[in-house]
């Protein structure tokens, strides 16, 4: 299971990025495919009500995935710097602590959902009509939370250990298992949204088994090991977890941005267009994680290169990694935007019959919605750059701008001004405004450096 050692300190940055990016991208897209496959089968097996029900659950699930990405990004940055200084034991301890922490989070939240499913569904904004479907999905999906968070952290550690291809296969295996089980549970067995949720839980278990097997028995530098109890060890644990949360918080905010988008979007669409509007928005939101994962794959591929060379003081290699990641973000953003503008019928048709009311609403909105994807992916790559260098303040600032400061007002104001079209344009405008702030920040910083160097 071992792969060739990756030399983060000497190999050409563009070649390093390619080695990491393509396996990471395929793996991340496979992770998104797990939920999207649910949507395709639910859309054709249950209908737009099923998609709306799953979409109501997604903000909570994204928030928890954000916690996993936060811990994965945070522990990976710290472990990268430890490894650049030859401190392998501390790197392993950091990753083990992250795994333990996400285990506690997932068990706590999963237990709450199982104890109070209807209350959780209503808290997420479910209508009485959709409540039985939402409860079914929540109850049967909650066991997967543990495995999803394990995978989220493990993939960071595996890429850092020089095993990006195996990390990719963990996600692909989970997606493949999900396809088979979704078909079996929804169509032959007729289990509906419950079947989709149960299929996701089992598929995540399969992916987590591969990832944890690697970290327990095969990893070179990021292998899990036992943590000794004791007062000082416990204090060190909480201190280290705090640092990981601080460094990775922008990754959490990235997922929370999507969770906020879904939560507020569900409410706004429900108010303007009812359950059909939520179903239409739900189709678009099945694609949003793919766009997010593209940006995330760029940031995660650049992260070990940036963090390692930042730890060794190789400034030019850090800048080179930034240039490569920005170029990749622009290319991927243009392709994503073009797909939504040119092929809305094809994209919507994967989930719903084109003559469906929800489908018609989605087809009209997709071209507006897709205009923001260039800026969406670019913003994620820049936030990842700052996060990789432990520059928490700008990373969090940009993440908060796109997730709260700009997005929420856009959702409130644009529908009042432009009607339904304004709901679709809320995300693009929020991302464009964030990009403008980032560009101005870079310009000011460049001028300050030029003045200092004179």
Question: Predicted segment positions?
Answer:
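Short alpha-helical transmembrane segments in multi-pass integral membrane proteins
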Residues: 1-24, 79-146, 190-249, 306-372, ...
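Alpha-helical transmembrane segments of multi-pass membrane transport proteins
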Residues: 15, 30-31, 68-69, 109, ...
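Transmembrane helical elements of multi-pass membrane transporters/channels
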Residues: 19-38, 140, 174, 203-207, ...
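Helix-terminus/linker motif at the lipid-water interface of multi-pass membrane proteins
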Residues: 33-51, 121-128, 184-191, 252, ...
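Interfacial helix-capping/hinge residues at the ends of transmembrane alpha-helices
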Residues: 39, 76-77, 118, 155, ...
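Small-residue-rich hydrophobic transmembrane alpha-helices
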Residues: 51-111, 148-167, 280-342, 376-395
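Short runs within selected transmembrane alpha-helices of multi-pass transporters and secretion channels
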Residues: 72, 141-159, 167-178, 196-212, ...
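Structural signal for membrane-spanning alpha-helices in multi-pass inner-membrane proteins
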Residues: 113, 156, 182, 186, ...
């Amino acid at each position: 299971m071992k792969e060739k050692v990756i030399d983060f300190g000497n190999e050409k940055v563009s070649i390093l990025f390619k080695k990491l990016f393509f396996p990471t991208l395929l793996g991340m897209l496979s992770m998104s495919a797990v939920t999207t496959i649910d949507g395709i089968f639910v859309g054709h097996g249950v209908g737009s009500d099923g998609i709306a029900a799953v979409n109501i659950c997604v903000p909570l699930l994204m928030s928890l995935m954000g916690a996993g990405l936060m811990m994965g990004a945070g522990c990976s940055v710290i472990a990268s710097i430890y490894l650049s200084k030859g401190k392998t034991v501390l790197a392993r301890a950091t990753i083990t602590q992250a795994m333990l922490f996400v285990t506690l989070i997932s068990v706590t939240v999963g237990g709450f959902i199982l104890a109070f499913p209807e209350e959780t569904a209503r808290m997420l904004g479910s209508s009485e009509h959709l409540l039985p479907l939402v409860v079914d999905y929540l109850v049967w999906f909650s066991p997967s939370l543990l495995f999803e968070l394990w995978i989220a952290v493990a993939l960071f550690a595996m890429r850092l250990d020089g095993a990006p291809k195996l990390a990719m296969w963990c996600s692909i295996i989970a997606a493949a298992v999900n396809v088979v089980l979704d078909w079996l549970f929804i169509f032959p067995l007729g289990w509906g949204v419950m079947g989709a949720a149960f299929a996701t839980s089992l598929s995540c278990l399969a992916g987590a088994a591969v990832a944890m097997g690697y970290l327990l028995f095969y990893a070179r530098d990021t292998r899990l090991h036992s943590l000794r109890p004791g007062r000082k060890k416990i204090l060190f644990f909480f201190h280290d977890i705090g640092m990981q949360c601080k460094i990775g918080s922008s990754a959490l905010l990235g997922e929370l941005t999507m969770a906020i988008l879904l939560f507020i979007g569900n409410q706004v669409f429900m108010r303007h267009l009812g359950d059909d509007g939520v179903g239409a928005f739900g189709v678009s939101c099945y694609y949003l994680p793919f766009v997010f994962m593209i940006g995330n794959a760029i940031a995660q591929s650049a992260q070990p290169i940036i963090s390692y060379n930042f730890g060794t003081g190789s400034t030019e290699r850090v800048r080179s990694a930034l240039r490569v990641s920005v170029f990749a973000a622009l290319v991927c953003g243009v392709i994503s935007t073009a797909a939504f503008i040119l092929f809305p019928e094809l994209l919507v048709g994967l989930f719903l019959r084109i003559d469906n009311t929800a489908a018609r609403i989605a087809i009209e909105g997709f071209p507006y919605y897709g205009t923001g994807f260039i800026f969406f992916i670019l913003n994620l790559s820049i936030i990842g750059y700052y996060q990789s260098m432990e520059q928490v303040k700008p990373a969090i600032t940009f993440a908060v701008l796109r997730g709260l400061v700009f997005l929420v007002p856009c959702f409130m104001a644009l529908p009042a001004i432009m009607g339904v079209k304004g709901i679709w344009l809320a995300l693009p405008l929020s991302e464009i405004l964030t990009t403008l702030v980032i560009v101005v920040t870079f310009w000011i910083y460049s001028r300050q450096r030029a003045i200092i160097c004179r």
